[in-house]
């Protein structure tokens, strides 16, 4: 803020609404009437769109309204008056629905007044925040039992009054009584809540959700009535054409007759301009005449209304009457007068004025100021703005209507036929002009709504909607983020010599980036020198800012002039008195010098894509003369995910003291040592430094005094780092035969010089990455041991100073703070660089070679593995390896035809070959290498974690192994070969992509080709997943950005809704809690930690007794007492810790595994020892210090922590769940399914069921067979059809098809599928024939269709998919009534091809799969609306379980019916199903065949009966559990997993309960979260979300802290449903701006404007839109300074 001109006001909230005619006229300075923009001299015309009253037209012109030039004129609105009202295209659907719900006779809603009143009461209560009362008001009618008929039974609101015993008057009287009682209830509820101070005007997610539900129900209720409940009239239906025309469809004959009998007549709303309606509404009576031109005066029905009929050539208007917009408006005006009470609750209205129907129509169109439609000038030519084209068209259409209306009102002699025709033609042209005007208005607001937008050739000018929406729209491109000044961008290059928290700035940036520093006595000399140096010499300055804000540029000044100005920096401005500003205010402000960036300034560095918090950090500037690139330390590479192969980075220079201090103390690099995703370290040394760390700390490295001191000096830089040239050294470890220091002593010396002088040294025990066995069989160099800051044992490698948890640097960070840890990294980096220069490091070919023995091992193993391919193939098809090749090929042929079986073969083959690969690698590396570690530098790199892994070594030295594509082996071509050089269907491993060669000695051409295939797949995956994960992260971000920790430890959304009572359920910060359970570390460093936490000052401020004593009770009796966190806030009560942590501390103190805690006896003797009570107090204190800070944006952190790792995941990863199983969706597709679509129908639903103890394998197998879906085709061996023509003479002839199904033998199908012969018999004679009948009918119908040549939309051509109806208009419509709720807004779905071609790298919109899911959600099957029982009951329709069915069948078998009777009975059943069934038979003895004969007329089209029967067989189900297709036993996850489990494909939880004898009911699990929600409730679903998301990441070994997952799961379920992170989910956000900045801007804008929503700017997005600081982090509180009266000077 400029203190010279402070701004004392800010935007508090934003209210949305709609400008009416008067508002537009008030803000307008001129009516625009001239469609011509410029005259012949290129000057703006009067009354044109560039009229100077609207603002300056070019740079040199002056505004005619405020007389300012183009820099200062704010711009002024104009307006265009339309000759007739036009429909507002964004509100058209809403308006159309209201029209359809209106009775055109009484102009009330067709719904009864009582029901409308109920909705009014509910909405009113919800507006006051009374959710429960809103539910209760529905029951008022039942409890009071007001309306009774003559029998004394309650009368349903909607029941027909004429049928009941009551007369109209009685019902009306009772309805009035009921309404009065409801009103009293509402008034009492509001009064009570006011009294109890419960009223909360704040709109919450829950209230909004409920309100939308009520509104949706209201629209559904009013639009579902055919006859008016109030006056019993039948109103005509309507039909709309596009967004421009509405037609009235005449009443049916029956309804017309009814209306004539009742004598009801519609008033003519066109003829009647009825002043009283307008006065009722609070309008001036003459408002019409002033706003609408003489067109309104035309009586469109005066003589011959026929010209208005059938004007449309479209078939939709056949027999229908075209309605003018005036007529529609007049109907709705009357509705709004009659139903004003409820409509004012639904729609926005001004204070003191009721809601008006005029909001749906445009009479005056506001014209934006010229500065928002600037003309572009090229030389002498002026090009108009593309927006003007739309406005000009409206002007031209308006003028055309005015001239046509004159022609049509000319007096005509009724006898003149020609005159009448002319007038009729004029009418027709007038109507067409009305429609054209409507199209032009539509184009202005939404260019997609205009049908004649000019085809493919020309680009359509964007409408207002297009300007606002999508990534290039106003919201996302110009409000949510902007381009900034004081930024620089360049290539980055590495520099190991600067500090890790510094950034090297090239001089070219240093002289351009400036900071406005106020001049004071303290910095006068510095600022003076800067001004004298000027803009080109560093450190100089570019401008001086005077007290009144004027700037003086130093660019054109000479050194003498600059010196003169520099000397006056403390002199007050001379012309202040005459300036318009107050002298007293400005006298206290300083001059400012825009000085160059200098060493130590904070710069914010950022590398895109900015996926998580550490992608943007603050570094200290260090100007490096002679450089041209940004120089950065290696330790930051991980944070930015940067490398130096040409990456560019952005640099920003904060311009205010607040921003600088936040950068210096919060965003600084040292404070970002731990990543919020998992709490692990992110910064560490890499590559050469790691190798040098290993060499430096080897047991056999010794240094002379010179080397020791030289290394220490180079590392510590005592001259620069504020150590005043002093270095503390250690005595040499070796005195004889010479004086030598060890490498370990150098590390100890570094720590000694870095640690704070008043603190004890570091005590640490950790593991090295290099195992001890690599040095010698019994070496202990694998464990690192520090005692009081001295390195006693162990090698320092990646696990000590790389980005690894619990290593040296991480422990220093925990003990001494981030600054010391940052300095340690810098010092180690310089130390290892210096050592590398002393020692050198290289890698040679000999490091890659195997010795003779190693080569022999490799050769022998490969020789033994040659037959593995044949063995695996033979085993898979159940043959021995010496079986004839022909037999093997015959069996394999079947496998290759079935993709699932082929997948099984691939898995078997891969398993066998991967075993070979592993055995070769294990044998040859490291034992078979020519040079052994540590002298093998390749091994040094891989073993220490510096670069590469064992995979790289093995591919170079051993073999490449099996190549995989999408988890499968290399696929075969049609010829049966994988490449032309192989034999068809070859079983060798090589032909399936196994590469036995190595890079060292070269690979064969075929192997090279396979390797390239696998590489290409990886590249494609990388390219595709960037956009997928980018959009996923954006969806998470927009929903969660408002979630923030409050001062009461709760996590709340920006509307105040509580999402969690404790963040992550224990209130701990992810990064602070990492060391919390490292009890050994805490005990060893007890003294240092006590000093760090300043125990005495903390204990004086908190209660240390209450919570601790309560926690002991609560832990002993958890069912009696609530958890301590629930009762005592952890920030004020020491000992208020989570139960899990308390148990862990207790367990450690009791077991005392490290013998660090003294017993009571020992601590009595020596008071300084660490005893149990001291240790517990320390741990409680550490817990309190690890609490999450209030104001922390945990929602943003959670979304980044899910989004960032998802970019590391492969896109389409499939996990093979065992033979016969479908793949399980994993990776990004699964994440999108859980999080973005919250899908109720997931791609691969499965259940995991644990078998009860004692269930035998045989019973388990039988259970799987019972649950499996069995279709008839699985028991049919072959189908035979005989066709013959029978009968004499052409009239009597017929075609007979004899169908015979040959089944497998009864023993085979009973063993394999556990199915009885009777089941097959019954299925064949019943279900099979029904399905066959349907298939034959469908086939004949299609062939008839083909013959007739007629094309029907519903029957696609061959090879074309039938287009789902929903695709035609992907509007968010729920049922027909939902049209009223939502505008058909398809922001993210339109122009799909355009977005695909652009492939916006990181934030693409929803893809096809998302749209399908969105459509599913839009239907009525929203999870929260699902009737809990209905859906699952339907899932298990058969009233008996499968086992009951079998028992019943067996009983039937015992009551044997004779075979002949069975045959007769089944033939009778068959004839009922198929009238043309002539004969039916079944093998009742052996159950091995079934026959049926079907007769057709001779002229029936030829039927390909075999394929039809095969199709019928595959569709005929013998037995199934609905929803479940397969069941199979689950292979154990590990050797420890001994519990037998089965997996089902498909989910039906209720049906599985039937099998309680086999299945453990407490161990059922499914990956279908929506099913869990329906059956087990919301808490179970919430836990399932956490489990599912974490298992998706678990597959890739990515650690995401459970606190983030629990927050996401809580957010998705805290409303009681399963909310998706998409635009359906954000619908219930209370901030309109937040919704608009996400997707479908105009849909949410329309909604907000119609409802009159208020955005209170509590959401981060909405604050950003209006330019206010966010209310989170440092913005979540204000700082007040105490005002102290200073004594008079």
From Swiss-Prot:
<keyword id="KW-0548">Nucleotidyltransferase</keyword>
<dbReference type="InterPro" id="IPR015699">
    <property type="entry name" value="DNA-dir_RNA_pol1_lsu_N"/>
</dbReference>
<dbReference type="Pfam" id="PF04997">
    <property type="entry name" value="RNA_pol_Rpb1_1"/>
</dbReference>
<keyword id="KW-0862">Zinc</keyword>
<feature type="compositionally biased region" description="Acidic residues">
    <location>
        <begin position="281"/>
        <end position="295"/>
    </location>
</feature>
<feature type="modified residue" description="Phosphoserine">
    <location>
        <position position="159"/>
    </location>
</feature>
<dbReference type="InterPro" id="IPR000722">
    <property type="entry name" value="RNA_pol_asu"/>
</dbReference>
<dbReference type="InterPro" id="IPR007083">
    <property type="entry name" value="RNA_pol_Rpb1_4"/>
</dbReference>
<dbReference type="Pfam" id="PF04983">
    <property type="entry name" value="RNA_pol_Rpb1_3"/>
</dbReference>
<dbReference type="GO" id="GO:0006362">
    <property type="term" value="P:transcription elongation by RNA polymerase I"/>
</dbReference>
<feature type="binding site">
    <location>
        <position position="647"/>
    </location>
    <ligand>
        <name>Mg(2+)</name>
    </ligand>
</feature>
<dbReference type="InterPro" id="IPR044893">
    <property type="entry name" value="RNA_pol_Rpb1_clamp_domain"/>
</dbReference>
<feature type="modified residue" description="Phosphoserine">
    <location>
        <position position="1441"/>
    </location>
</feature>
<dbReference type="Pfam" id="PF04998">
    <property type="entry name" value="RNA_pol_Rpb1_5"/>
</dbReference>
<comment type="similarity">
    <text>Belongs to the RNA polymerase beta' chain family.</text>
</comment>
<dbReference type="InterPro" id="IPR042102">
    <property type="entry name" value="RNA_pol_Rpb1_3_sf"/>
</dbReference>
<feature type="region of interest" description="Disordered">
    <location>
        <begin position="269"/>
        <end position="295"/>
    </location>
</feature>
<dbReference type="GO" id="GO:0003677">
    <property type="term" value="F:DNA binding"/>
</dbReference>
<feature type="region of interest" description="Disordered">
    <location>
        <begin position="1346"/>
        <end position="1440"/>
    </location>
</feature>
<keyword id="KW-0460">Magnesium</keyword>
<keyword id="KW-0597">Phosphoprotein</keyword>
<dbReference type="Pfam" id="PF00623">
    <property type="entry name" value="RNA_pol_Rpb1_2"/>
</dbReference>
<dbReference type="InterPro" id="IPR007066">
    <property type="entry name" value="RNA_pol_Rpb1_3"/>
</dbReference>
<dbReference type="GO" id="GO:0046872">
    <property type="term" value="F:metal ion binding"/>
</dbReference>
<feature type="binding site">
    <location>
        <position position="66"/>
    </location>
    <ligand>
        <name>Zn(2+)</name>
    </ligand>
</feature>
<dbReference type="Pfam" id="PF05000">
    <property type="entry name" value="RNA_pol_Rpb1_4"/>
</dbReference>
<feature type="region of interest" description="Bridging helix">
    <location>
        <begin position="1005"/>
        <end position="1017"/>
    </location>
</feature>
<keyword id="KW-0479">Metal-binding</keyword>
<dbReference type="InterPro" id="IPR007080">
    <property type="entry name" value="RNA_pol_Rpb1_1"/>
</dbReference>
<dbReference type="InterPro" id="IPR038120">
    <property type="entry name" value="Rpb1_funnel_sf"/>
</dbReference>
<keyword id="KW-0804">Transcription</keyword>
<feature type="modified residue" description="Phosphoserine">
    <location>
        <position position="161"/>
    </location>
</feature>
<dbReference type="GO" id="GO:0003899">
    <property type="term" value="F:DNA-directed RNA polymerase activity"/>
</dbReference>
<keyword id="KW-0240">DNA-directed RNA polymerase</keyword>
<feature type="binding site">
    <location>
        <position position="76"/>
    </location>
    <ligand>
        <name>Zn(2+)</name>
    </ligand>
</feature>
<dbReference type="InterPro" id="IPR007081">
    <property type="entry name" value="RNA_pol_Rpb1_5"/>
</dbReference>
<feature type="compositionally biased region" description="Basic and acidic residues">
    <location>
        <begin position="269"/>
        <end position="280"/>
    </location>
</feature>
<feature type="modified residue" description="Phosphoserine">
    <location>
        <position position="1438"/>
    </location>
</feature>
<feature type="binding site">
    <location>
        <position position="643"/>
    </location>
    <ligand>
        <name>Mg(2+)</name>
    </ligand>
</feature>
<dbReference type="GO" id="GO:0005829">
    <property type="term" value="C:cytosol"/>
</dbReference>
<feature type="binding site">
    <location>
        <position position="63"/>
    </location>
    <ligand>
        <name>Zn(2+)</name>
    </ligand>
</feature>
<dbReference type="InterPro" id="IPR045867">
    <property type="entry name" value="DNA-dir_RpoC_beta_prime"/>
</dbReference>
